[in-house]
A protein has these predicted regions:
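Radical SAM enzyme core and accessory elements
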Residues: 127, 139-155
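Conserved AdoMet/S-adenosylmethionine-binding subsite of the radical SAM
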Residues: 1-124, 128
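Residue-level detector of anion-binding/catalytic polar loops
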Residues: 131
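Conserved beta-strand termini and adjacent loop/short-helix elements that scaffold enzyme active sites
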Residues: 98, 135-137
């Protein structure tokens, strides 16, 4: 992942980069995304900082809102701190809040955050001057929506 970010920065600086974050906490992110054990968030953030510094392009942080898991005020405040700690270029970080889309193949341990929780999360980011948007839910009826954490296995 980090070598890919560096390669993208070097070879395709005009391309906007989106990074799947889903938790500002290392331990929880490792539980949600095992790749975090190989590429810890703090090291990935260093690579993303270098990308932003070199390209001066907005970087998108995708954040799937999982009810009762990563949608608390504590998570929002930690995410704001993570972005603000980027320093002078923190204004180039943008958060896309993505409502979790449940399908017949997604993990049953996850549920979607409710709209009020998503709004409160967004408001905390806004109050910290973090650029944030909440994505609309499209495509979940056909298994094509953002916010679906699963792999379709075929025989």
């Amino acid at each position: 992942m980090i070598p890919g970010i560096k390669r993208l920065t070097r070879d395709f600086p005009q391309v906007n980069l989106a990074f799947s974050l889903h938790s500002p906490f290392e331990k929880q992110r490792s539980e949600l995304m095992p790749i975090n054990q190989t590429y810890p968030l703090h090291k990935v953030m260093d690579a993303l900082d270098a990308h932003v510094a070199n390209t001066k392009r907005r970087l998108f942080l995708a954040y799937i809102m999982l009810g009762g898991i990563n949608d608390s005020a504590e998570h929002a405040k930690a995410l704001a701190h993570l972005i603000l700690s980027r320093g002078a270029l923190s204004y180039l970080y943008h958060v896309d809040l993505i409502p979790y889309n449940v399908t017949d193949k997604t993990a049953r341990k996850f549920i979607a955050s409710n709209n009020e929780t998503i709004k409160n999360f967004s408001d905390i980011l806004h109050s910290n001057r973090i650029s944030v948007a909440t994505r609309m839910q499209f495509g979940s009826d056909i298994g094509a929506g953002c916010g679906q954490l699963y792999a379709d296995e075929r025989d």
